[in-house]
């Protein structure tokens, strides 16, 4: 089949581009002709020009992500900047199926209806979601918008979501059945990333702690972790998450703020310990069998990581705060990855079955 993926491939965000890459590769393994639907936000060009003009750091980051996009997230459709353009031209692409997801593609109040595939004619193209997320734990009622989204979702052939709360929203708010699947990045094991994105990078055994902290807690946690690691003769690196983060944040010594997608992955692979409140950083800590702690992200989005940790029986790796007890646990209580891999294997097979039976 000719399949189009509708997601945040354009975002300067490691998780966004990696989940797109992972889903694309898995669908290609299953024998499909896979394209990225190049739907871009209208504001993208304006912001990009402004940041290029005033921020060298942004330019470096943009170049890194642009390289990944042009090298790995291909082929793409023509560029679409509006619903009007999609409605006028998308039918000419002649897709058999469009898959929306993964990531928080169903945050309707920010993104509108395109990610509910309002521009796709169901008579000619099947609509499916894979690991879509609403970006909220409960639906915020909005009258006519809720009705319109319900009508759009009823046109989907199959619906799958990433969080348990998403299953509930689909059932109780929109009256549709949704299946729970894993994030696309976990459809592959560590060896896949080592053979594709990390084949030119060295694997080391340095005693090192890596952290990736989102939001306003960043600076305090960074200093605390840096001091804690120094006292234990551990190297310490702080990874930023998106270009927006490094444009606004103050950095601790040793921060990496314009590394490539592969370099970001390699930092996690080469770490001994990982501390994060980022979902995808936690995902790769698990895939690379790292000792890790996930902190509560007070800006939201905790449902996705709690769903995953519960499924893998790793609830003890989640903490609402950062203190010495948590960090000592990180060092002294090895994660039983043999058992984790067995549970992950079951989840992976279930999610692959969803894709194989589309």
Stretch-by-stretch model annotation:
Residues 1-358:
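Active-site anion-handling motifs in enzyme catalytic cores
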């Amino acid at each position: 089949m000719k399949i189009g993926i509708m997601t945040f491939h354009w975002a300067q965000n490691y998780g966004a581009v990696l989940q797109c890459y992972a889903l694309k590769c898995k669908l290609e393994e299953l024998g499909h002709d896979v394209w990225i639907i190049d739907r871009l936000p209208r504001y993208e060009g304006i912001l990009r020009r402004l940041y290029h003009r005033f921020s060298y750091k942004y330019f470096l980051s943009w170049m890194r992500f642009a390289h990944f996009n042009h090298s790995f997230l291909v082929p793409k459709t023509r560029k679409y900047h509006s619903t009007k353009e999609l409605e006028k031209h998308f039918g000419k692409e002649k897709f058999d199926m469009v898959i929306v997801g993964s990531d928080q593609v169903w945050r309707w109040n920010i993104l509108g209806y395109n990610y509910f595939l309002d521009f796709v004619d169901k008579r000619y193209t099947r609509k499916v979601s894979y690991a879509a997320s609403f970006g909220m734990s409960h639906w915020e009622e909005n009258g006519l918008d809720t009705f319109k989204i319900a009508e759009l979702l009823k046109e989907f052939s199959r619906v799958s979501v990433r969080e348990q709360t998403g299953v509930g929203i689909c059932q109780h708010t929109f009256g549709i059945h949704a299946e729970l699947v894993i994030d696309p990045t976990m459809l592959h094991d560590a060896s896949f990333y080592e053979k594709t994105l990390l084949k030119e990078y060295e694997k080391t055994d340095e005693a090192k702690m890596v952290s990736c902290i989102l939001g306003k807690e960043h600076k305090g946690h960074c200093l605390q972790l840096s001091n804690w690691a120094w006292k234990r003769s551990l190297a310490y690196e702080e990874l930023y998450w998106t270009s927006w983060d490094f444009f606004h944040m103050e950095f601790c010594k040793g921060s990496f703020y314009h590394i490539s997608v592969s370099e970001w992955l390699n930092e996690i692979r080469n770490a001994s310990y990982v501390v994060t409140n980022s979902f995808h950083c936690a995902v790769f800590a698990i895939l690379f069998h790292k000792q890790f702690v996930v902190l509560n992200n007070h800006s939201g989005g905790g449902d996705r990581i709690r769903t995953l940790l519960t499924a893998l029986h790793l609830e003890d790796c989640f903490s609402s705060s950062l203190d010495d007890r948590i960090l000592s646990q990180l060092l002294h209580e090895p994660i039983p990855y043999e058992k984790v891999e067995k549970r992950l294997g079951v989840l992976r097979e279930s999610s692959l079955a969803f894709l194989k039976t589309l």
